[in-house]
Amino acid sequence: TGTNYGFAFDIGTTTVAGQLIDLNDRNILGTRIAFNKQAVYGSDVITRIIYASNTAGLDKMNEAVLDNINEIIQDLCSAQKIALSDVYCIVCAGNMTMMHLLLKVDPTNIRKAPYIPTTTVFETIHAPEAGIEINPKAIAAFLPGVTTYVGGDIVSGVIACGLAEGDELSLLIDIGTNGEIVLGNKEWMIGA
């Protein structure tokens, strides 16, 4: 009970979307979408990976997306008259490149054969450790990916639509800058 708020973020190549959620009743209190500020360094993931491999490039990419996240948090909390200290949780999902850049993990291997990311699983940490400006004790969780081209954004879609629990064959399509699809049911899935 009491004031208990959280955020859900979709870190996309083109846009960053955030939702403010009342964690007590699960109501969505607001949504904001902004163009991903990393776009000034390249409009696609390959260009951004190359830029990130340059001196201070990874830091600049990280700062750009953190600016997006913190501005959206500030905007939504201000609109609802919610103190940042009342935000206790943030969950982020994105394609594998976006998650690497958000967490300052070297993304170089994503674009080089055999195309294996540095990691597909990201540690849950306190939000300030990631540069996210909410309650200092708030938890920041990052959805895992499966492989280079099946990131946490697709994993979250599979969870949200219940694809992994259904008997019927279903198709999930993520239409964005980098399109992905998953076909399957509770028995099997294939993604591309």
Give each language-model segment a name.
Residues 1-101, 109-111, 141:
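N-terminal glycine/serine-rich phosphate-binding loop of ATP-dependent small-molecule kinases
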Residues 4-6, 140-174:
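Conserved mixed alpha/beta core segments that line enzyme active sites in large multi-domain catalysts
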Residues 63-67, 148, 177:
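Alpha-helical multipass membrane-protein architecture
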Residues 12-13, 18, 26-44, 109-124, ...:
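Glycine-rich phosphate-binding loop of actin/hexokinase-like ATP-binding domains
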